[in-house]
Structures are given as structure tokens and as C-alpha cells.
Amino acid sequence: MDSERREFLETLLSTPSPSGYETPALRAWIEYVSTFAETVETDAYGNAVATHEGKGDLSIAVTGHADEIGYAVSSITEEGFLRIIPVGGSDPTVSRGTPIEIQTAAGPVDGVIAQTAIHLRDRTAPDETTDIAAQHVDIGAEDEAAARDLVEVGDPAIPAIGLTDLAGSRITGRGIDNRAGIWVAAEVLRRAIDRDLDVTVHAVATVQEELGLKGAEMVGTEIDADAVIAVDVTHASD
């Protein structure tokens, strides 16, 4: 991967994009593909499609979803803590102690999902905080009024976890599911244009996959492709 492609991947991974709030990531994707795509279009649902018009009759679509799992603020307590609910399939067993970033109209607000110190836990009692809705987020607010000055109910949030390079060519980070997919779709389109393929190629970035493939259902009725390749991540079980 050259430096330009790496920079594009880093931009996608650093841009918050929880389901239903994909606009920032889609803007970054559109800005990139607009430098080489012949056409770039969006639909009413928020999906983005960049196209190379081939001279032949065949067409393919390469798709990925732009959204990621996250949270949404559901309430604010009198003590100034936030209650959150999952957006998509967030795992409650790993959320406690996780730093998060709440996306507000005024900009990001940092917080952490509270974790009871091991010294204070009642190990004989059932652990109710395995439910994300029972967990608290501390943003440093002294009380409810102070918290409401910073955050509103309904604001989305994401884990505040960045990109880390592992050994070899592997990486770990937030949002690889599925910024990797829309990165691949853009790269396939770029290479198709470089080679001036006769096949028409659509690169597609869809929305709200984590909520039930909602964006893909809509865009699937808009693109008349002979074949569709959906790119997504899967379990590291090999």
C-alpha cells in the first residue's frame, strides 16, 4: 500500500461514523473518489455511488458499508453521568472501562464508560452492568446541568480507539468494520479507471448496515449490475 492509499485508509478510520450518522465518513469517501471517478451520486438515504462507465455491456458493483457500531446517549442522571444504548451490535462485555467520544453539535466530548474498582465489587451479586443500558459514562460533569451543557440526549458516541499497527502488515482499530470495505470498493474503482476497463464498475458506500442492511436494500434497487461483490470483515477464526 502506497502512502496515498494509506492516508485515505487512516482518514476513514479516524472519522466517526456510527449507524445513522455516517455523513462525515461518506464526505471523506466522496472527496477521495471524486478525484478519479467519472460520476459520484448520493441517494435520499445517504448511500454514495461512484462509477466508471465502461464501453461494454457488463457491469459490476463493489460495495462496503460506511457505518460502524457505537452508542447513543439515552439519558442523563442527576449526578451528571450519561446512560447509553447500543447502536448496532456493541459488545457489553468489553465496553466497561472504554474511553468514548460523544459526537455533539458543538464538537466531540470525551468520556469513559465507568468500571467499578475490583476492590469494591460484590463478587456474590449478579453483574447487571453486562447490559450496556445499565452502564454509566463519566464525562467529568459535576451534575446534570453541567452535563447537559455539553451533551444532549440522542447524541451518538464511538469508542475512542485509534489505529495501531501490529506485526507485519496487520492493523487493529475502531471502525475497520467496515471502513475496510469502502476502502476496497474505492480502490477497485480507481484501478478499473487506470486500466480503462470495458466493464462498468460501481463503487458503493452504504449506510446503516449495522441496523439491518437498510442502505443496501435501497441502493440495490437503484443499480442495475450484473454482479455485486460485497466486501466486509469477518471473524479471525482461522
PLM regions with names:
Residues 1-238:
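N-terminal hydrophobic/helix-forming segments and targeting peptides
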